[in-house]
């Protein structure tokens, strides 16, 4: 849901097809929401066109009202994802200093066309394994731990 303040853990998602969307796989939160998402596994996701990103983590989603309840994202593995076109950044993970993302694995990800490949901030223990955007292998991301 859009506003989720509880715990989500031990989830497995597979074999999904997405025609056209803003974000293919989208995790969003802010400092008002709290809770956690952990031990999530996703695989075999096919997307055609994603306007804002095929994979997008955002812990600074608008609507913040001054709370101090960061959502914890940890132990997330996303693999075997293909996307034909992204109109913004293909892979984004934007944590905050007080709401970092932990243990994120992206494996066997292929985005055929995107103006920017990757943008990562405040991610601890990011693994990029066989990730390709615009025909180029992505092995690291500039990030702030």
Residue spans for each PLM region:
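Repeat-solenoid scaffold signature
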Residues: 20-22, 29-36
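Generic long, charged, amphipathic alpha-helical segments
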Residues: 54-55, 67-83, 88-91
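Mature catalytic domains of secreted/periplasmic carbohydrate-active enzymes
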Residues: 27-29, 57-62
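Short, small-residue-biased leader/transition segments that mark boundaries at the very start
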Residues: 1-4
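Right-handed parallel beta-helix
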Residues: 7-20, 38-49, 74-84, 102-110, ...
